[in-house]
Amino acid sequence: MEPAGPAPGRLGPLLCLLLAASCAWSGVAGEEELQVIQPDKSVLVAAGETATLRCTATSLIPVGPIQWFRGAGPGRELIYNQKEGHFPRVTTVSDLTKRNNMDFSIRIGNITPADAGTYYCVKFRKGSPDDVEFKSGAGTELSVRAKPSAPVVSGPAARATPQHTVSFTCESHGFSPRDITLKWFKNGNELSDFQTNVDPVGESVSYSIHSTAKVVLTREDVHSQVICEVAHVTLQGDPLRGTANLSETIRVPPTLEVTQQPVRAENQVNVTCQVRKFYPQRLQLTWLENGNVSRTETASTVTENKDGTYNWMSWLLVNVSAHRDDVKLTCQVEHDGQPAVSKSHDLKVSAHPKEQGSNTAAENTGSNERNIYIVVGVVCTLLVALLMAALYLVRIRQKKAQGSTSSTRLHEPEKNAREITQDTNDITYADLNLPKGKKPAPQAAEPNNHTEYASIQTSPQPASEDTLTYADLDMVHLNRTPKQPAPKPEPSFSEYASVQVPRK
């Protein structure tokens, strides 16, 4: 007898159970086979470029969307949701609308250092009401290779004088990776006294660098520059440079020199104050006379030196006639808001101004009088010479025009020959009559020492008759030629005749 089979009413439920179990086992097998694969462990992208993050799934089961996150844990940031949301910087690599598409890679455009981090591709299973995270990829670390910003160099807040040490700082930000090189230069010469720090110390999406250098100032640093140079892997070509001009940092104090110039006018002395080698140009000068302010002025027209410093000169006219005593002149300079520096000069007043003026006038008058005397003397000398020459000519002409002679008559008086024959020596005499014409008076004060005389000599002769001898004396031949007239008196001279009377 055949065994009885299952009742027809019980066969339906059993088939349903078998089908359900079969479906359950197949679903579990699909879930166990699903894998989310992120093949790239890290991606390095330059700032401004587009980063591609790859992700694939091995199965479409379970049903549910794919989402991208940056970071893990509760604070993770949603980057892309396949199901919903608006993400303008994110695009998918493949067309997710295609059937059986299992490529869930994305692209992120215009990358910035802030985008750096680890990105995760996560598979969700459809649930009600919310989807449930099913499986996540291993993650891809996105590194942004960012260029450093242009270095900014800053100096001290206040100016410093030469021989002082000042500090300069250099800063650059937003670069990645962390490795960076920084150097300092002054006028092309590398500096060694500086310290550099890169922050933060640990991992970060971007970094900053800060460096401080020490520089010793000199008087020639007005045109000098300090340079901060930054080199990074993201830079192509020359490194970045930041500069600072030492002209914004240095202050060169002036040197003063006060000198006295020659007198420009009567009783006025020019005193100059030369302000040399100063920087910057801001300068105020004050003149003091014996401590009292005389004039204040601001440097306007200055002369620039080759080293960038300036020169300026101020002058002061001092009226010495207004001072009885010596004057102390002071040139006081205030430069760039600093305490005033000064230089003094003592102006000597040797005598009372009026006496000095009188002496000067007397000297001028004496000089003029001497000149007048010289001129008058020369003229008088010429006139006297002409007058003497004229007198000489007149006198010569008068003498030639006279034409008369001086006659001398010698008389022998009556004598009683018989009465006086007894006398062996006859007495003979001569009467010398020398007629003279009037001479022109050459000068009132001129003496006329003129002597005319006759000498009679007797000598023994043989006895003979008395002889009467006449002698005519020509005045023309007796007169010597007179010397030329001169201011001195004429020398005296003598005119004489010798008559010899022989005895009989």
Curated annotation (Swiss-Prot):
Phosphotyrosine PTM positions: 429, 453, 470, 496
UniProt cross-references to CDD domains, sorted A to Z: IgC1_SIRP_domain_2, IgC1_SIRP_domain_3, IgV_SIRP
Motif SH3-binding, residue range(s) on this chain: 439-444
Keywords: Disulfide bond, Glycoprotein, Immunoglobulin domain, Membrane, Phosphoprotein, Repeat, SH3-binding, Signal, Transmembrane, Transmembrane helix
Motif (SH2-binding): 429-432, 453-456, 470-473, 496-499
UniProt protein name: Tyrosine-protein phosphatase non-receptor type substrate 1
Topology of this chain in the membrane: Single-pass type I membrane protein
GO molecular function: cell-cell adhesion mediator activity; GTPase regulator activity; protein antigen binding; protein binding involved in heterotypic cell-cell adhesion; protein phosphatase binding; protein phosphatase inhibitor activity; protein tyrosine kinase binding; SH3 domain binding
Disulfide links within the chain: 55-121, 170-228, 273-331
Effect of residue 132 to T: Requires 2 nucleotide substitutions
Extracellular membrane side: 31-373
Residue ranges of every copy of the Ig-like C1-type domain listed in the record: 148-247, 254-348
Job of this protein: Immunoglobulin-like cell surface receptor for CD47. Acts as docking protein and induces translocation of PTPN6, PTPN11 and other binding partners from the cytosol to the plasma membrane. Supports adhesion of cerebellar neurons, neurite outgrowth and glial cell attachment. May play a key role in intracellular signaling during synaptogenesis and in synaptic function. Involved in the negative regulation of receptor tyrosine kinase-coupled cellular responses induced by cell adhesion, growth factors or insulin.
Major subcellular location class: membrane
Polar residues: compositionally biased ranges: 446-467
Glycosylation, residue list: 245, 270, 292, 319
Pfam families associated with the record: C1-set, V-set
Assembly description: Binds PTPN11 when tyrosine-phosphorylated, except in macrophages, where it primarily binds PTPN6. Binds GRB2 in vitro. Binds FGR. Binds JAK2 irrespective of its phosphorylation status and forms a stable complex. Binds SCAP1 and/or SCAP2. The resulting complex recruits FYB1. Binds PTK2B. Interacts with TRIM2.
Positions on the Cytoplasmic side per record topology: 395-504
Chain positions covered by the region annotation Disordered: 336-364, 402-504
Transmembrane segments: 374-394
InterPro entries referenced in this protein's UniProt entry, alphabetically: Ig-like_CS_Receptor (IPR051755), Ig-like_dom (IPR007110), Ig-like_dom_sf (IPR036179), Ig-like_fold (IPR013783), Ig_C1-set (IPR003597), Ig_sub (IPR003599), Ig_V-set (IPR013106)
Ig-like V-type domain span: 32-137
SMART domains for the chain: IG, IGc1, IGv
Location(s), subcellular: Membrane
Record note on modification: N-glycosylated. Phosphorylated on tyrosine residues in response to stimulation with EGF, growth hormone, insulin and PDGF. Dephosphorylated by PTPN11.
